[in-house]
Amino acid sequence: MGFIDEVKLCLKAGDGGDGCASFRREKFVEFGGPNGGNGGKGGNIVFISDANLNTLLHFRYRRHIKADSGKNGAGRDRSGTAGKDVILKVPVGAQIIDEESEEIIVDLDKPGMEFQVAQGGKGGLGNTNFKSSTNKAPRHFTYGQPGEEKHVLLKLKVLSDVGIIGMPNAGKSKFLTRCSNSDTKVGDYPFTTVRPHLGMVKVDDSEVVIADIPGIITDAHLGVGLGHKFLKHIERCQILLHLIDVTHDDVVLAYSCIHNELELYNSDLVEKEEIVVLNKCDLLREAEILEKKNHLANYLNKEVLCLSINGDLQPILRLLSEKLKKSNSKEIDVYDPFKA
């Protein structure tokens, strides 16, 4: 299945139906009075977050979305029927952004959230509404109001507890494949992952959602490489699992490359909890591994873990689970109208 995480939409809510100017016409009733009905309300455009979706692919060929307009009123006090609402389902984690102002309209970060983005126009009034003691036969009616029109950007940010980051070919995909049921593509070449993958990991009595973020390279924040469009997915993660290929000539440089790109993209990302792991440790002698581990640990002033290609993952997974339980990570400042 394809993966699309950004799409522009043109939304047009339904127009309100026009009111009707009509008069009662019956035999032997010379002056029947007004009986024009009101116009129906235009349909709204509503977004709902659906936990069963994980891409915006279904909007690929549906960029212009229009709700039904309300029907016009009619004689005998018949009101027009309201236009049907358009319900658009999006994955959990989708943000709806006003294209012009670039402000976030809503952040649908929980399952089942519902938000009306474009409101249908009000229906016009029939001439019955204008009858009075001084005007018993009004011919006045009003037209329906136009529905809202909005140009929005849908942006999907993957929701996960842990984000696996690192340079291309650091072993991120294989780590996720081994510890979860995620069927990710694995190969010994850079950029194996070209879209974020999610995996569910059972750790003792808890479950951890882990995301494999595509490899990040120097100047990714400027659009270089495949990592650029996926940097935003890291914002949702509570903890970062930073994998570094131990065979890299300079493990400090490998770490700094990723760290700097995160900071340049969003400085809040480097404040997140991070576990650093030297991966593929079965490819070097123990003395070389120890030297690189100590070098990186001294640079970071914190513990660095080691992992072989087929090594036991449970210690790392348990550490992630424990940190998640204690985690009170700093959240990215996103306007949430549900909490406003």
Swiss-Prot record:
Obg domain sequence ranges: 1-159
Binding site for Mg(2+): 173, 193
Compartments, record wording: Cytoplasm
Chain ranges of the OBG-type G domain: 160-329
InterPro entries in the record: G_OBG, GTP-bd, GTP-bd_Obg/CgtA, GTP1_OBG_dom, GTP1_OBG_dom_sf, OBG_GTPase, P-loop_NTPase
Gene3D superfamilies linked: GTP1/OBG domain, P-loop containing nucleotide triphosphate hydrolases
GO biological process: ribosome biogenesis
EC number: 3.6.5.-
Gene Ontology cellular-component annotations: cytoplasm
Keywords: Cytoplasm, GTP-binding, Hydrolase, Magnesium, Metal-binding, Nucleotide-binding
Residue positions binding GTP: 166-173, 191-195, 212-215, 279-282, 310-312
Single GO MF descriptor: GTP binding
Listed Pfam families: GTP1_OBG, MMR_HSR1
Cofactor(s) the record lists: Mg(2+)
Superkingdom: Bacteria
Family: Belongs to the TRAFAC class OBG-HflX-like GTPase superfamily. OBG GTPase family.
Quaternary state and interactors: Monomer.
PANTHER family: DEVELOPMENTALLY REGULATED GTP-BINDING PROTEIN-RELATED (PTHR11702), MITOCHONDRIAL RIBOSOME-ASSOCIATED GTPASE 2 (PTHR11702:SF31)
Function: An essential GTPase which binds GTP, GDP and possibly (p)ppGpp with moderate affinity, with high nucleotide exchange rates and a fairly low GTP hydrolysis rate. Plays a role in control of the cell cycle, stress response, ribosome biogenesis and in those bacteria that undergo differentiation, in morphogenesis control.
Protein name in the entry: GTPase Obg
Source species of the chain: Wolbachia pipientis wMel
Taxonomic lineage: Bacteria, Pseudomonadati, Pseudomonadota, Alphaproteobacteria, Rickettsiales
